[in-house]
Amino acid sequence: QYDPLLKGAIRKNLLTERIDIVKPLGWYRDSPTLTDVDVKYLLLYFEENYGLTVEKKIIDAVAVIANENRYHPVCDFLNALQWDGTERIRFCLHRFLGSDTDDYTYEALKLFLLGAISRAFKPGCKFEVMLCLVGGQGAGKSSFFRLLAVNDDWFSDDLKKLDDENVYRKMQGHWIIEMSEMIATANAKSIEEIKSFLSRQKETYKIPYETHPADRKRQCVFGGSSNTLDFLPLDRTGNRRFVPVMVYPERAEVHILADEQASREYINQMWAEAMEIYRSGNFRLRFSPAMNDYLKAHQKDFMPEDTKAGQILDYLERYSGSMVCSKQLYKEALGHDYDEPKQWELREINDIMNNAVTGWMAFSNPRYFPEPYRRQKGWERIRNDNEPDNSMDGFQEIPTEEMEQLGLPEEWLKQK
């Protein structure tokens, strides 16, 4: 701590959770991280200058001094930025990748930047959004994420499998991690694993040579890239975690690697702009309700065609009744010969009606339907207040199926 050579040289890096040597000490080094060779030099230095030879005590002292002089390189970088006042977040993805400059693209990138900043200053904070850059093979999507990480050591694209026992070590020391094509090649089970993985705020594991495992709060965010347009699995409920942005390289102002230094300077100023928003405290790490609604609709452009939902929508447009049930839709909309449908088939129809169809509202109390459906739960058409009133004297006409439920006399039904 007081040695003129070592003072301020040994620090704990809070991003990598390793000890760094941050200034020259008189021997060749090619990495800031403390190595076994560094330890040997330090032992020799302490022996020659102080007569100390107890290796364990010296190593323990190095660990204590490093911890008292800890630093976070990402936070230091962000705190040192000075914004020049020029807006760049809105135009960055268009400049380098040809994306739109609309509010959605702006909000998507802004949210991702603020999530990354928050994870640096408040490790483990809740943030489960993945910015997904889609299309444009060779456009520079991966290069964008790499340059966005500022320092190549803070970037990784080596996270290929989430069930790898070394997955946590591959995350260690990185600020921005790209998952290239991981979602596009995932099946339903692995998509759920990705969702769960993105939702985590910490990992519990033991660093080699440590005695006890510890909670490691996440300091990174995840970006996705895909050349496949329908990279998202079919999910009628939508998924707030995946935020797709289409790239059009032919519309880009400049390729991000055409002048890497200029691109880095632009991105640094974009981080400075994001830091102004972060310091103001006027932000949330999630979309507004209106933007969430837009996201849900927008995600459908990146999913396989939902043919069953289309069949049901076509049927409902032609259907004149006011109630439907899942078995009715199974037979009449999807064209199955009527027999007892499997439960997963009924659940799929329920999913479509509740998430992909508008103008119909579910009812939970079973009602009577014509044969062969009989007593079922289902959906009723939502009446539009602007629809013409075909009733007389203020009374509305009751549909036949509702009259049947009321148990009205058969002659009344015949008169109708």
Predicted regions and their residues:
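Conserved AAA+/SF3 P-loop NTPase catalytic/coupling segment centered on the Walker-B
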Residues: 176-198, 232-238
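P-loop NTPase catalytic core of nucleic-acid-dependent motor ATPases
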Residues: 62-172, 176, 334
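N-terminal nucleic-acid engagement/recognition segments and initiation subdomains in replication
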Residues: 1-91, 103, 107, 339-340, ...
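DNA-recognition alpha helix
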Residues: 326-338
